[in-house]
Structure formats: C-alpha cells, structure tokens
Design a protein with these regions (language model features):
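Conserved non-catalytic scaffold segment of RNase H-like nuclease domains
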Residues: 1-122
C-alpha cells in the first residue's frame, strides 16, 4: 500500500486498541492495530490479539466482540512489547481519541513491562 499525499518528516503510526475496559491503570489491551505510514509513502499494517492475563468483562466483549476464548492462546503484552516498541521506534503517534485513551493505555502497558522500553520523548 502506498500513500503519496502525506509529507512526513518521520513515520506516523495510527493506533487503535481494544481493551478489557476504560480504566488505564487497571485494564489491559486485548488487540492492537497499527497502520504505520513511512516517509517513503509505504504503509505497514500490523494487527495482533493479546492475552490480557485477566478475564474480559462481558460488557466490553459486547462492544468489541472479543471474548476470553479468542485470546486465551495469544501472547501477553510482555511477550510482544519489544517487537512492538521496535515497530513504533521513531514514529509520531495518532488515532481517534488517542491522546485521551489509546496512547495513555499503550504507555501504561509498556510501563508495566519495562519503563525504558518505550519512550514518548520527541513524539507528536
């Protein structure tokens, strides 16, 4: 996939999360999708389900359609964290409502794993 109309100075990662709930401190990511627009116009898309290590409340499952059974054999965030951090390296971050929810949730998940793994400095 190519995007030719964006004039990027660095890659832009558009992030969408599905989670066990909306409490950033307590809830966990169960699916992440990242569409990364590179400065050469190419786009990479990665989607991964994640085992949250906790039950998914039925109220959340009814919204996003992801149930405990769907993630029971998936890797944990800790198992994916390093490769995800590498994929997001040097990217600005974007997404719908991302500054209020998705980015804080993502940062919190990285902090649970390793505080030095993911850095928000120099990102927009």
């Amino acid at each position: 996939m190519q995007m030719h109309s964006l004039k990027l100075k660095k890659p832009l990662a558009v992030i969408d999360l599905e989670t066990t709930g909306i409490n950033v401190a307590k809830d966990r990511i169960i699916e992440i999708c990242v569409a990364k627009a590179n400065i050469d116009g190419s786009v990479e898309v990665k989607t991964k389900r994640i085992n949250p290590g906790m039950p998914i409340p039925i109220e959340s499952s009814l919204i996003h359609g992801i149930y405990d059974e769907d993630v029971k054999d998936e890797p944990t965030f800790k198992q994916l964290a390093r490769s995800l951090a590498q994929f997001l390296e040097g990217c600005d971050l974007a997404g719908f409502n991302s500054n209020r929810f998705d980015i804080p949730m993502l940062v919190e998940e990285f902090l649970r794993v390793d505080s030095d793994l993911f850095d928000m400095k120099n990102r927009k």
